[in-house]
Amino acid sequence: MIYGIGTDLVETSRITRLLEKYGERFARRLLTDEEWPEYAKSMQPAMFLAKRFAAKEALAKAFGTGIRHPVSLSHIGVTHDTLGKPYFKFHPELHTLVQNEGITRHHLSISDELNLACAFVILEK
């Protein structure tokens, strides 16, 4: 049974402006410690952050809460399996919410094209 669906679309130029204005502080607020090494190696930092932001915002929409504790940017990690399929890694506090809501599976799709990053999330009970 579907618990929630969320999607988000981010213009990379918006992320570029935030990086120019706030620098590394912006990236630190958006990423988990586990995401940081991949970001540091990225050849396109604005696109990397745009895709991460879109994924995290889409998850917040699927929860129906928006970005608010414990569904916060720093509590949502995005990683991928050996084939490149993206998935979420939840901070323990967020993981507790996932369990309490009876969410058993999540699906994440991320795409980008030129100046846009898009993410789609389905949460299942």
Curated annotation (Swiss-Prot):
GO MF term set: holo-[acyl-carrier-protein] synthase activity; magnesium ion binding
Keyword DNA damage on entry: no
Cellular compartment(s): Cytoplasm
Keyword Chloroplast: no
Catalysed reaction, written as an equation: apo-[ACP] + CoA = holo-[ACP] + adenosine 3',5'-bisphosphate + H(+)
Record GO biological process: fatty acid biosynthetic process
Enzyme class: transferase
Cofactor(s), names only, from the UniProt record: Mg(2+)
Biological role: Transfers the 4'-phosphopantetheine moiety from coenzyme A to a Ser of acyl-carrier-protein.
Family per record: Belongs to the P-Pant transferase superfamily. AcpS family.
This protein's name: Holo-[acyl-carrier-protein] synthase
Organism: Nitrosospira multiformis (strain ATCC 25196 / NCIMB 11849 / C 71)
Gene behind the chain: acpS
